[in-house]
Amino acid sequence: MSDYKVTVLGAGLAGCEAALWLAGKGVQVDLYEQKPMHFSPAHKSEGFAELICSNSLKAERLDSASGLLKEEMRRMGSQLLQAAEVARVAAGGALAVDRDTFSAEVTRRVEECPNITVHRQPVEHIDESAPILVATGPLTDGKLADEIGALTGDERLHFYDAVAPIVTAESLDYNKVFAASRYGRGDADYLNCPFNKAEYEAFHAALAAAERAPLHDFDTGAEQSARPDPDAHGKKADTVTVYEGCMPIEIMAARGADTMRFGPLRPVGLVDPNTGHRPWANVQLRAENKERTLYNIVGFQTNLKWGEQKRVFRMIPGLEHAEFVRYGVMHRNTFLDAPRVLSAGLCLKEHPNVFFAGQITGFEGYMESAACGLLAARNLYARLEGRELPPLPADTMCGALVQYLTTENKNFQPMGANMGILPPLPEDKRPRDKRLRYMAQAERAVASFQQWLDETAL
């Protein structure tokens, strides 16, 4: 045990990952979480590390951006990845979890850690007299949001996240729904709902015309203006700046008749056993729990009114009698103007004792948020030790994300892990095959990351 003491605000993925890592170094951590005294509009559970948008933590292959990120996290000692293994549900080549089991496992690890003291109460003030890590998430509001705004001297930015509905397995029509993964890769962990052309066109028309739920003042900031994309009938609605990775399905439908067919409803790699042919379009369902009694509708984040969700989504083949245990919702996502206010060590340039982690920084995604918590914790601990860590190599996934976060950008938007932010390979070492190229980039990243860890041993 050391004499160091640190405050962490927020027990989401980033806050829990940071608190557990710091506690593992002997630091005494005071972890503050506002639930259950106060819930954000999107959170329902009292547990820590609550997953909202999806139960998928994305791909595990090293030659994928998400898989590479996970490998770098493992090398930093991620406890959330260990918790994810406990809560794993089958999802082909992806790491998906039972949300409740995952949250319970993370909560257990935090509450049983002797170096972490949990305070179930909101915080309204940031004390700069000692290092503090703010990981309060994308729905930070109230006096704490005002405090952050005062520290950064910047109007907070915002965009919108949307959540997909969940249906019961027993309510599905298995004469139409079939189990398969694309191209037969891995186990048949997804259920598929195949459309023919006429069914799809009717569904698209109904979806494009469906009535959306009004956004609350906490979401819109009480601002009203025209939506950037008119719906199929040319009507306008409230403007929202939507993160592409959580795009509401109705906004996608408004972009064109085939947009969904080349997005979440793409039929490639699938054959409908009832016809022997590839469907015109296809909706996938992914298990929400280990028992596979619940499924979420993949890619169907939405802000439709609940009655409209039931009416329109029951037009999906196999979901005609679907029982919805959760409807989709839409909520605001608040984040810093990171390039202007954050250093490469994830602390405020003007207030170096104040560190930030998670989605509030502009890291977008579950695992990205957790990775950010690990990185911020390492930098904070180095500060306690009187050191400053050198920047992460830009050819690592974590390094590329931090570089994106802290590089000047007049139209800064959150970013998740993707191979496109890694620097290209030298021409003479650049395979033409994309999968081989990604593997070469991943192997380079792992080597660079391990070297950085060795050189900055904490």
Each model region followed by its residue ranges:
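Helical element adjacent to the flavin cofactor pocket in flavoenzyme catalytic cores
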Residues: 99-118
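A glycine-rich dinucleotide-binding beta-alpha-beta segment and adjacent secondary-structure elements
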Residues: 297-363, 370-372, 390-407, 412-418, ...
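Dinucleotide-binding Rossmann-like beta1-alpha1 core, especially the glycine-rich loop
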Residues: 50-61, 85-101, 105
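Internal hydrophobic alpha-helix adjacent to the cofactor/substrate pocket in enzyme cavities
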Residues: 369-391
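N-terminal FAD cofactor-binding segment of flavoenzymes
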Residues: 20-82, 394-405
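Predominantly flavin-linked oxidoreductase catalytic cores and closely associated redox partners
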Residues: 112-286, 291, 295-306, 310-311
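Beta1/beta-strand and adjacent pyrophosphate-binding region of the FAD-binding site
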Residues: 2-14
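C-terminal auxiliary extensions adjacent to catalytic cores
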Residues: 412-458
